[in-house]
Amino acid sequence: MQGLTAPAAASPATALLRRRTAGTQQVQHALPGRALRWRRERSHHGFIVEALQSEAPEAVAHKPAVGKTQHKGEPTRHIDEMIGTVRASLREMGGGDINFSPYDTAWVALVKKLDGGEGPQFPSCIDWIANNQLPDGSWGDDAFFLVQDRLINTLACVIALKTWNVHSDRCNKGLSFVHENIKRLPEDDENWMLAGFETIFPTLLEMAKDVGLDMPCDDPALQDIYAKRDLKLAKIPKDVLHSVPTALLLSLEGMPGLDWDRLFKLQSPDGSFLSSAAPTAYALMQTGNKKCLEYLTDIIHKFNGGAPFVYPVELYERIWVVDRLERLGLASYFRAEIDSNLAYAYRHWSDEGIGFTCDCMVRDIDDTVMGFRLLRQHGYHVSTEALKHFETKDGEFVVYPGQTNQSVSAMYNLYRAADQAAFPGDDGVVRRAKAYSYAFLQERRASGDLNDKWIISSGLPSEVTYGLDFPWKANLPRVETRMYLEQYGGSDNVWIGKVLHRMHLFNNELFLKLAKADFSNFQRQCRLEWQGLKRWCEKNNLEMYGVTPQSAMRAYFLAAANIFEQDRAAERLGWARTAVIAQAISSCFLSSNAYATDSMLEGLIGELTSDGHNLARRGGKYSTTENGLLNALHELIDLSAPGKDASDNLREAWKTWLMELTTNGGHESCGGNTALLLVRTVEICSGRHSSANQNLKPAEYSQLEKLTSSICSKLGSRSLSQVNQNGTTMENTENLEQQVDQEMQELAQCVFKSRDAISRVTKQTFLHVTRSYCYVAHSSPETIDSHISKVIFEDVV
């Protein structure tokens, strides 16, 4: 949601969530205890567990690229407590949780008793104002000083206190603040101008004069505000204002000459005007409308005298919290809550888009594209029709019709939606949306102007930069999370509407603390697994076959950056070891290495064709060096596959791969067949081996295989052509990119669509492997090395 955003009464879990400090309880991690726990893991982890057990002491002592001090881990119990607190807050979601608005509260406080008596209709609002003045005499966000925010909140509160002649000391202190700071208006970043400020603040100045307050209305700092007001009012078509729901309904209190009979046709079902307290209070003062009174009475009672900027905001909150949990790498802990939120969003989806609440009469592009992307990625069918409502005749995409300037964050969310959730056969609007948003963001990036009109976030520029540099197809989950840990502002992020406001549920320190603790645990496990993998490579003399520590590290990184859950070590290491062995065999085949003999390849195929037990009993048939490769393959097949059926499946997969390798002169290993071998290995190591059984494959599985093989083959052939410098033309490269993009859309549709025949995690395996190929093709070796360092070895602080 953009520019519209209310606090739910803090539940116990939410209150605890807010009280969590950024500090992290740290204790020394008990590696021997972890080794004992691993020893009790299921037997099919086999050599993976044994390697980790044997490497644990060395892994503690050996700290390559980590530095002199190693980050101490969160106790599992403490992480579980944080997960429990977050889960409770997610399950207690109501109308939305944002902070209160002194400005809106002041407008409600101005409503006189409707029964004809003296005094305010809502005296609790006066009490709230008196109790929430800041030490400098102002009202507003206490952690971020924006001149406009402090002035509009403070002046509104001063007017309310003066109107009822109460708390004169607070009134005078607030008035002094206004006089002292009005000259500072030009200091604010133009991108951060409050919505409607140019019409609302001059209105407040006139109201202040009417109640006898001395106002510096001729201050030079106000001249620009007056000019913007006159320009905006001249541009507003009064007929549209009174007949079509627009964002202007948020600022009715700053609009002259309103026709209330016509405007009430735009009143929301809950009695408000666009679910906002200030325009609703103004309408109540002007008309005495009972539905306005009911809305305000409910709000003020619910929040004990305070009024939020807008309420409810439950649709906005539910969508955004899913996005934050996924990007922080925490989604696996909250599957049920995420599913519930998206089911709610889908119930209220329309082809005209969505807004910040289910009954919102004004849809915005930000909520719409965030919902569009997340719903599609979770198997819901949503069409592209909604995007057309935000495309202008000039080919631009806007948050609202009639907006005065563009939003960086909204265009970034539009780009993410068009990049990540485009399917074959989509209307051209998706392609146009991607092209427009990409061009806009690149232009703002080039000019160094990535501050946004809707959110104040120090991490937004780097977030946008990373998103533009790494399109979704080449963006690995754990790399994205590692970057987002530095971009996610937590409770420091401030949203801009008519006032500054904060969304407590999805911008808080507990989310950040939990995500960092979880990622640190992941890093510790990766370092242990890497030590085991490196030792395994050394034991089997794989360096003799061209496997360097760097190439083995890269193979492990690609696996861990995709499959990162703590209980999926077998899948990670199965992927990594398969990639390493495939590289070793390919190197032998393609080089003049003395060990790369025809007899060895024939022997490998022969062993795979046999009953599967000869590998362990081959005696002196091969040299010690050759035995290393056979040993490695033997361990992978017989020890990582749980049960004879699984090992037979994996043996058959290797046989197929080897035969394709010999048939195609070794080049095929760079692409599709190796990718399918990785997929089948991951599935077998996970225990989901029935899906990889050639005789049990449903049609959808075959389609996933076909697309994965095709994409990875194209990327592999492109890499080979670059290495061989065979004169590939730019046109050919562009054609190849277009084909890959088209097939990636097909693969995404196959993976995301909801089907019961194949599990979601199995479909994700195809996507993980394919995106890893895209990532390697997209990234320079230096970039990959920097990501390895950041994801695995650089402590999260």
Regions found by a protein language model. Name each.
Residues 1-797:
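Terpene synthase/cyclase
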